[in-house]
């Protein structure tokens, strides 16, 4: 199949590889981006362990936590232009939708649209009224709701939203020191972008694929040709350990103190507060993650939504 210059440029942007290598990989992969990235990694040309996302949509991500009811929410609402995120009516809608999710626990975005706001209208009606005022296409894209002790953090005025869920003992979550710790962990997720909480939460197939890629890289390096299998196995174990350290939250280097891992920092805080802390799960939303601006006629779409 024909590979366009645009596709080659996008792959280069995602992998930092040369233009010709990107074109060759895309050709071998029949235009499949994920397969092309895998090919480049096997050749030792691309080291990114995570899928790159093309971020193009505007709007905002918001996160909030209610300590009294122990419910946390992170939500993404998209719009056409970046200045809409600074509009008070838009921000009010996002916060109202967050409250509705907290209180009514809708199963998904479709269910959320049917929920009633404090004003008595449905979220869908409130959204259509907002579109009439702002005159832009606005969509609630996704949300996550956790019950239990949480920490919510919004970065960059709504570019990133983080929600972290914890298990604690001895009511230490009510202490100011724990609140500060929770914010630290949420900021860690924002900055270091882990994929998993710990090694146990990494799917076996992901580890197997990483090992497969590592073996392919080693096989392609002449320096490894005469190395004993035991040595190669040790090298693989070292690479897997590095993979966990980069991708598992508790194994990561704590961004505010490089002498500690997140697990060590957590243990220290728990000991100081006289209780136990376990990081259970987290959600990290980045505004527009995986979306691209479209060339569609948004005016027609907006008109159809408010009919």
Language-model features: where?
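N-terminal assembly/interaction segments in proteins that build large macromolecular machines
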Residues: 2-307
């Amino acid at each position: 199949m024909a590979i366009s210059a645009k596709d080659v440029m996008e792959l280069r942007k995602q992998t930092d590889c040369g233009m010709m290598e990107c074109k060759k990989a895309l050709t071998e992969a029949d235009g499949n981006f994920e397969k092309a990235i895998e090919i480049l990694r096997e050749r030792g040309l691309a080291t990114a362990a995570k899928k790159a996302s093309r971020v193009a949509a505007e709007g905002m991500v918001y996160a909030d936590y209610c300590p009294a009811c122990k419910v946390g929410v992170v939500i993404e609402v998209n719009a056409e232009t970046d200045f809409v995120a600074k509009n008070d009516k838009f921000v009010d809608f996002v916060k109202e939708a967050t409250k509705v999710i907290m209180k009514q626990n809708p199963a998904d975005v479709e269910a959320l649209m049917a929920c009633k706001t404090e004003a008595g209208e449905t979220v869908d009606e409130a959204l259509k009224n907002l579109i009439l005022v702002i005159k832009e296409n606005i969509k609630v894209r996704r949300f996550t709701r956790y019950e239990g002790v949480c920490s919510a953090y919004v970065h960059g005025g709504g570019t990133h939203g983080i929600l972290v869920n914890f298990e604690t003992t001895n009511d230490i979550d009510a202490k100011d020191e724990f609140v500060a710790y929770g914010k630290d962990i949420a900021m860690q997720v924002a900055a270091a972008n882990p994929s998993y909480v710990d090694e146990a939460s990494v799917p076996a197939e992901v580890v197997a694929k990483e090992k497969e890629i590592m073996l392919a890289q080693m096989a392609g390096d002449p320096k490894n040709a005469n190395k004993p299998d035991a040595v190669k196995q040790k090298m693989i174990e070292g690479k897997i350990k590095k993979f966990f350290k980069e991708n598992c939250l508790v194994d990561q280097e704590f961004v505010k103190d490089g002498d500690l891992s997140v697990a060590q920092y957590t243990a220290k805080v728990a000991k100081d507060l006289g209780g136990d802390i376990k990081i259970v799960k987290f959600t990290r939303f980045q505004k527009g993650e995986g979306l691209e601006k479209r060339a569609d006629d948004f005016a027609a779409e907006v008109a159809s939504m408010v009919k």
